[in-house]
């Protein structure tokens, strides 16, 4: 289990605020049974979401394409 840093994730998203929104929405999806794109390794959903963002296996379009996910801003 590798440590995930904010800097690793910021290479894939525009800013810290977008990172918080996307990672929290993805963590919620994982908690509700969404299929992870990486090996789980006993991580919590929040860590898994950050790992997926850092590894660029998911992006904004993937997270927001879930019909149960509310609009990004407003």
UniProtKB/Swiss-Prot annotation:
Q: Which Pfam families match?
A: RNA_pol_Rpb6
Q: Which InterPro entries match?
A: DNA-dir_RNA_pol_omega, Pol_omega/Rpo6/RPB6, RPB6/omega-like_sf
Reading the lineage from the top rank, the first entry is Bacteria
Alphabetized, the UniProt keywords read:
DNA-directed RNA polymerase, Nucleotidyltransferase, Transcription, Transferase
- Which GO molecular function terms does the record list? DNA binding; DNA-directed RNA polymerase activity
Catalytic activity, reaction form: RNA(n) + a ribonucleoside 5'-triphosphate = RNA(n+1) + diphosphate
Q: Look up the EC number in the record and give it.
A: 2.7.7.6
Q: Which SUPFAM superfamilies does the entry link to?
A: RPB6/omega subunit-like
Entry's Gene Ontology BP terms: DNA-templated transcription
The record's GO CC annotations read: DNA-directed RNA polymerase complex
Q: How does it assemble?
A: The RNAP catalytic core consists of 2 alpha, 1 beta, 1 beta' and 1 omega subunit. When a sigma factor is associated with the core the holoenzyme is formed, which can initiate transcription.
Q: What does this protein do?
A: Promotes RNA polymerase assembly. Latches the N- and C-terminal regions of the beta' subunit thereby facilitating its interaction with the beta and alpha subunits.
By its UniProt entry, which PANTHER family does this protein fall under? DNA-DIRECTED RNA POLYMERASE SUBUNIT OMEGA (PTHR34476:SF1)
Family per record: Belongs to the RNA polymerase subunit omega family.
Read off the HAMAP family from this record. RNApol_bact_RpoZ (MF_00366)
Query: What's the protein name?
Result: DNA-directed RNA polymerase subunit omega
What is the species listed in this Swiss-Prot or TrEMBL entry?
A: Hydrogenovibrio crunogenus (strain DSM 25203 / XCL-2) (Thiomicrospira crunogena)
Q: Which gene encodes it?
A: rpoZ
């Amino acid at each position: 289990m590798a440590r995930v840093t904010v800097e690793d994730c910021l290479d894939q998203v525009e800013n810290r605020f977008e990172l918080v929104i996307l990672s929290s929405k993805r963590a919620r999806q994982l908690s509700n049974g969404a299929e992870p794109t990486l090996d789980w390794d006993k991580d919590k959903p929040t860590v898994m979401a950050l790992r997926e963002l850092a590894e660029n296996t998911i992006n904004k379009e993937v997270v927001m394409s879930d019909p149960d996910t509310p609009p990004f801003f407003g």
